[in-house]
Amino acid sequence: MLVVAACGTGDPPEPITPPLPEIDLAGFQQLLAQLDQPAIVNVWASWCLPCRAEAPLFQAAHTQHSQDIAFLGIDYDDSQRGARLFLDEFDLPFPHYYDPDGTTIAEYGGIGVPRTYFFTSTDQLIYTHNGAIDQATLALHIDELLNR
């Protein structure tokens, strides 16, 4: 009887609001075209341990460089609930989008998550980083974007 009570479903969880806006390839390309500055796009998922490890690096980089570089996040292969909890936990202040079927990131290549894309102010992809990024690599590519 105790086991049954402990395994009960109870009340359904509260919905996570607001949900991340969904984005597809056309919407992503339009978003990039509207930016007048270089962009760093981090692809992540809430269940991804390396994504969780690198999140503070992106928070710090955004704080330091948000006047000169646009930061965007794309949640991939995840739930809206997991995504919102991840963003709340890491307090990532830049825009994030939900790519439910992966079409946006498939266009730009790379493997798995995390993945980070570096775009010039003219929307040219200059570097794709697969896997967790470290501080030195992130700083190197930020410098490349700023000095183009």
Predicted regions and their residues:
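Bacterial lipoprotein signal-peptidase II cleavage site
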Residues: 8-16
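C-type cytochrome heme c attachment motif
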Residues: 46-53, 115
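Structural microenvironment flanking redox-active thiols in thiol-disulfide oxidoreductases
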Residues: 52-90, 100-106
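Thiol/disulfide oxidoreductase modules built on the thioredoxin-like
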Residues: 86-93, 100-146
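A short beta-strand-turn-helix
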Residues: 19-38
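Hydrophobic beta-strand anchors of alpha/beta hydrolase catalytic cores
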Residues: 40-41, 71, 116
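Short pre-active-site segment immediately N-terminal to redox-active cysteine/selenocysteine motifs
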Residues: 36-39, 44-47, 112
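C-terminal motif of bacterial Sec signal peptides marking the signal peptidase cleavage site
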Residues: 3-6
